[in-house]
Swiss-Prot record:
It is found in: Plastid, Chloroplast thylakoid membrane. It comes from Crucihimalaya wallichii. HAMAP family: NDH1_NuoI. Pfam families: Fer4_9. The gene is ndhI. [4Fe-4S] cluster 1 binds at C64, C67, C70, C114. One of its GO terms (cellular component) is chloroplast thylakoid membrane. Its cofactor is [4Fe-4S] cluster. SUPFAM superfamilies: 4Fe-4S ferredoxins. Disulfide bonds: none annotated. This is NAD(P)H-quinone oxidoreductase subunit I, chloroplastic. PROSITE patterns: 4FE4S_FER_1 (PS00198), 4FE4S_FER_2 (PS51379).
Length: 172
């Protein structure tokens, strides 16, 4: 009789422990109902990038003095700068400037150390292509400014900060 009573007590304790674990999981599930969804519908919705986002590089041909500082500070010697020395004025004349974004690691050193600020980072991050040679941008392609995500009326923009439905930020 005694082993039967202890067996029922053990069964009751295990049942209570299982119910407590199920209750804990249910409480976690309920706490997540107050949060905004994490996923977005990508082609139709895009996240607004921060100001310091390092996207595609924008190049201004007229400002460049062909000093090649960008090549020297690049960890992979990526920018290709072709120039010609003008002997009559003793200055370099820029002929061609290109960057292969298939190799670029987007470190931002070229933008940071450029003495004339002819390089800047944009918010463009979509580089999908079927041919890797299309990722090699010359000065004409680098000079085009991409359309801002905020200005594109076909895309719904979403702030890139975790918030709850009540509007409070849980990280603060």
């Amino acid at each position: 009789m005694l082993p039967m009573i202890t067996g029922f007590m053990n069964y009751g304790q295990q049942t209570l422990r299982a119910a407590r674990y199920i209750g804990q999981g249910f409480m976690i599930t309920l706490s997540h109902t107050n949060r905004l969804p994490v996923t977005i519908q990508y082609p139709y919705e895009k996240l607004i990038t921060s100001e310091r986002f390092r996207g595609r590089i924008h190049f201004e041909f007229d400002k460049c003095i062909a000093c090649e500082v960008c090549v020297r500070v690049c960890p992979i010697d990526l920018p290709v700068v072709d120039w010609k020395l003008e002997t009559n004025i003793r200055k370099k004349r820029l002929l061609n400037y290109s960057i292969d974004f298939g190799i670029c690691i987007f470190c931002g050193n070229c933008v940071e150390y450029c003495p004339t600020n002819c390089l800047s980072m944009t918010e463009e991050y979509e580089f999908s292509t079927y041919d890797r040679h299309e990722l090699n941008y010359n000065q004409i392609a680098l000079g085009r400014l991409p359309m801002s995500v905020i200005d594109d009326y076909t895309i719904r923009t979403i702030l890139n900060s975790p918030q709850t439905k009540n509007g409070e930020n849980p990280l603060i």
